[in-house]
Amino acid sequence: MAKARNINRPLSPHLQVWKWGPHMLVSILHRVTGSGMATVGVGVFLWWLGALASGPESYAKFLDCLTVESGAPNIIGYVLGIGLTLSFFQHMMTGIRHFFLDAGAGYELKGNKTFAVLTMVVSVALTAALWGWMIYGELAKAPKTETPIAVEKK
């Protein structure tokens, strides 16, 4: 059986000098958030759709898993909601970053690192702004609408 690497051959120089950077983290986060949104987001959507189609009792159980009596999210609802929102904004901001990279801009090392860090900061800021608006802003003051299926909580 052959060895994995011939020690008599030189190692490519670029493999000896690389350092971990924010641009690498953003690239990995882009893949993770895309997969996470596809898996978790579609799973929750299909769960909601199945509960909606199965009738009032199934829909009430779905709501009980994600909300409290007032209709506000419970801890599971907040974790899923904030997690999916952060994933969405991170994926979107990284997509915008890739758009500029595809156009040939932002390949200078300092600019690339700055744009990578900015991508993460802006995605967290957008998530915080959206959830702040939903919890404390105009959306919180909006009148509550009825659910698609009349659900009586027992």
Can you describe what each PLM-predicted range is?
Residues 1-154:
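Membrane-embedded alpha-helical bundles that constitute the cytochrome b-like, heme-associated redox core
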